[in-house]
C-alpha cells in the first residue's frame, strides 16, 4: 500500500483526518491514505495533538516518537512513527 512505508525502524503513514468524529478510530483506506477519525476539533492544533495521542496508543510508542512531517494545517498528513512496538491490524495485513 503506497500510503504505508517501513524504513529501518520507522513507519511512514499518509493519513486523511476526519476531525469532530463521534469516536476515535482507524476507518480504513481512503484511496492511498489511511483514514482516521478523531473526536477533536480542527482548532488551535487540537486535532494534531489528539491524532498524535491516538497514534501513540495504536503503535504503543511515546508521543515524542510521532512527528507530523507534512500537512499540519490540512486533513492530508504524512506522519513518521519511530520504533513502533506494534502495528494496527489494518497495517499488519498491508505489510504482508
Swiss-Prot record:
Q: Which GO CC terms are listed, alphabetically?
A: cytoplasm
Which InterPro entries does the entry link to?
A: DUF167 (IPR003746), YggU-like_sf (IPR036591)
Q: Which PANTHER family match?
A: UPF0235 PROTEIN C15ORF40
For this chain, the family text in UniProt reads: Belongs to the UPF0235 family.
Q: What is this protein called?
A: UPF0235 protein Tola_0962
